């Protein structure tokens, strides 16, 4: 493990020190100075960044290429105010905006492509927004807005907007082709082509990627395999344009869950037999599940399918000048998603073989473990019960955003109507399996040797399964959103701009869930091994059976969001602004399920409401820029809805407050020889009025660091050579609201280099070069394992050291 870190670092250092300094080349000067940038996200019309009263970060295509993020979440780590957990792999990651706590996903921040949501709700169960889009060379730009006007230009987004803007064709034909490989078996091809079919009139862009790799954590199967294609066609006429586009995504990715670690104070070390940097329970030897169902038939699943979305998107955009300074813009999109989700979710931590047998009712030393694969008797020191979770979701979303803009001498007014219909139908089938507590787990059977094989309860497993289909869920959620919004931009003077916005949301939600009963296979006529009936095993004792009784529910939203801001441009390089915003977030999917399946809920179901105040200072030149944005926010009716390993859900409510400051900066130094990029956040998120336990008043919000930042210096060694180092720091957090379970701070170092040879760019990028064991989360599904007194914990660390090499041709 240490050897891999040293080799990675040595290779990078060799290139660094064996070259001399020189000015930055034109080819690799990729960053557009902030003073020249124009932004649209969170604004009614394109506006110079220095004149926008928003906290917004931008990345163009070349900057994204230079950073070469392994996932969308890795790219968003470069945005201040966004605390991002990237340890799940390429998808399924979590983003927390400005200290707003949640169960994960993108609950308070809407992820968009070209100004419309990837899916209307980015925090549906097992359907994180980043499951359904990928960053590749078809991405032309990223704009990431925090807080502010997010609640005016989108629904359920008080935390901000993340807008991935696609490339479009121009009169000049342009293309990019990229080949990439890695230390973990990566083979990836990216292509993008764009140009004009009719000069000045008809433009096209088409591109995508295909990738396969073994995963940084060793699964013994293809951990990531698939790709996407995106295309658009734009026709420009005298008074506007019309654009149509299509996206097809078919990709599967392994999702990494907590592994056992040893905690000694603030020190985290490996659990015996488990590699913290490269180990995982998601392994080929336990990847197949085929079990009988109490309602008849068999249920089969393959872990190698991982998170597997099939996404089809078709959309159109139309803009027309109506005359008299009035323009109309209409965006429409239909999204269809078929998601198969399969993952290994630990059901607690490693247990001694004797203790687990005792838990299953075997007293004394009459327990016997054996390998399912060979039948060989074994005596493991520790065993691990794992949840084999299978979820299928069928989702669709039709959205239309119609807006009118009136421009006058001192500003403009935008008014619009937003309509979105969406549906999510899901089916769960969860079982528990028993394995060795090691890197490459083996399925185990457990029997009570004091009984005869024909005795009731002789076996505690069925081919390694301890609980067959213990949880089934069949449920649906639908949303019908009907929102009116208006935004005013007023230039009071040449330097002073006022902004005011309001959004009225009349939204309707409904759904159903199917009630379940308990069953077993005792009278099914099936056998466990061709001879013995299911009376001989306890694995089927608590099976779930879907019934015919449906529970239907409805929930309506009638809320107003609003914002007021001012931006004062001191001179061409300096500006200050302030903003107040009020927004909300509708209850999430699990909150609906919990509330409407509970006979007498102890809390009313309410939207989460937010109030935010921010002030900002911006200083932009061509070689230096900095933004400093203090903020204060309060939230009411925040619900915590983590799903536990036994299938039950947390149902906790709280109010929170947070005060902090975001800092973002860039500098070109020493005649462009060196570049320095920095973003960081200091905050102090606290609980207020946690329901049912006032002793938690003032505790730090769980999973939220008080300090996190990224700093990345780069040196242009010669006209062709460039090298960089990056440091991600993630401060100490608490896994629980009692603030007893500490997740230590950690730093992750990355490094890389590139060589520009004409239009060809060679690059090597390395991540976590020191093999840091950095924990991003504990195990929210098994909170008892994380108690402060336990030396063995379950947690999800970042990936181990890895390197990627790429060749890119721009033409």
Feature annotation, model-predicted:
Residues 72-75, 94-99, 109-112, 129-132, ...:
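N-terminal periplasmic accessory domains that precede
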Residues 73-120:
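Extracytoplasmic beta-strand/coil segments of soluble accessory domains associated
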Residues 117-146, 165:
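Short acidic/polar hinge/loop motifs at secondary-structure boundaries
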Residues 174-176, 181-281, 306, 311-321, ...:
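Transmembrane beta-barrel wall of Gram-negative outer-membrane proteins
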Residues 241-317, 340-389, 444-477, 481:
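Acidic/polar loop-and-plug regions of large Gram-negative outer-membrane beta-barrel proteins
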Residues 395, 410-422, 427, 431, ...:
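Structural signature of Gram-negative outer-membrane beta-barrels, strongest in the C-terminal barrel
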Residues 494, 623-641, 649-738, 773, ...:
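Gram-negative outer-membrane beta-barrel transporters
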Residues 730-734, 754-811:
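C-terminal beta-signal and adjacent terminal beta-strands/loops
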